[in-house]
């Protein structure tokens, strides 16, 4: 089932469009959902940029870190998650994939990759198969340093509790229910980016 009808989506993106302009395009009303998305995205961006500041040896692309952090959750409006003001039809789990489709329609493959690879610490084809997840088969793992940093930073913030910043221990505990591999990946990132 297609949750996003790309054929009917406007395609007026030129690579000069800012992250905020894209958000306002898909979230035109100043409502609780847009405010929550902006708040969460700024939290993730602030942490991702702090990683770049702490680790100049990584030569991270700060402009892209900001853009990707702001847009990693752009697909949430298409999902059914009323507790965070999302009244779409798709399962929340696929918000990254939906955001990736939006970004591809906008002509932004680089940001699309971040959208579809930030769930947990990434999803493998094995995860999708064994857990019967509603995603196309494939590996959705953050590969570039920027993809990894955005995924890492996102784990510290929840849209359900936007006022809180999780500790690394809380992040690890939240990932444990999905398996030890994700916890190990997070601790690897914590050692590298923390």
PLM feature spans:
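Generic alpha-helical structural signal
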Residues: 42-46, 97, 187
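Alpha-helical scaffold segments in carbohydrate-active enzymes
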Residues: 47-50, 155, 192
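Charged phosphate-binding loop/patch that engages nucleotide di/tri-phosphates or the phosphate backbone
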Residues: 175-194
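Alpha-helix initiation and N-capping motif
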Residues: 16-20, 108, 168, 183
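Charge-dense, low-complexity intrinsically disordered segments
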Residues: 31, 35-38, 143, 176-180
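Divalent metal-dependent catalytic cores for phosphoryl transfer on phosphate-bearing substrates
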Residues: 57-168
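A general alpha-helix detector
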Residues: 22-26, 47, 98-99, 152, ...
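Acidic/His-rich, divalent-metal-binding segments that scaffold phosphate/diphosphate chemistry
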Residues: 3-92
